[in-house]
Amino acid sequence: MPSFFLKQKTLIYIVIFSYFLTGCTLNKALFNGNNLNGWIPYGTEKWYVENGELICESGPNAQYGYLKTKKNYKNFILELEFKQEANGNSGVFIRSTVDGTKVSGWQVEVAPPRKFTGGIYESYGRGWLIKPNPAKDSALKMGEWNYMKIKVIGSSITTWLNGTKMIHFTDKKIGAGEGGIALQIHDGGGIKVRWRNIYIKEL
């Protein structure tokens, strides 16, 4: 085979390999740092952008509030950072659905110390499904930026907080779930949580 065709064939292989390599490592930003494009707020609590950060804050009604993606996500790796101010009781919902202003689904807890951050809670259902070992509570840095990773595949959820594996849980009901990703602010008032660097990789 002439060298010209060998070079062309090699170039094609390089392009194809690069395409698949990029596709396997590409993460999509769910928050653009400028506005709430791609998200829908539910409830009367405050959701706004400040200095490139997404902020949720208790509103006048001090009720539950949610910010949900317009798109649904089934199997994925979600990575984000959060910083709790004041109470800091919040959460990240996966495969969540909406009924009026009520968001149901499975919540990865984001809460003050000794309140099981990284555990899984089923809202409007069975309640706590799994809580992290209390010895792992030290992974939470209250008042500082925390890195959370959530992996959802089929019926299984695994969570990490600042590099510490918090839980791994498998459940048929979760496996059958369909819906979007939602951030939550707890009721009760006096809550403020900052979010940034929210990225997803669909699997």
Give residue ranges: language-model regions:
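Bacterial N-terminal signal peptides that target proteins for export
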Residues: P2-I12
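Prokaryotic Sec-type signal peptides and long signal-anchor helices
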Residues: Q8-K9, L21, N35
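Bacterial N-terminal signal peptides
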Residues: Y13-T22
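Carbohydrate-interacting regions of secretory-pathway proteins
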Residues: C24-L203
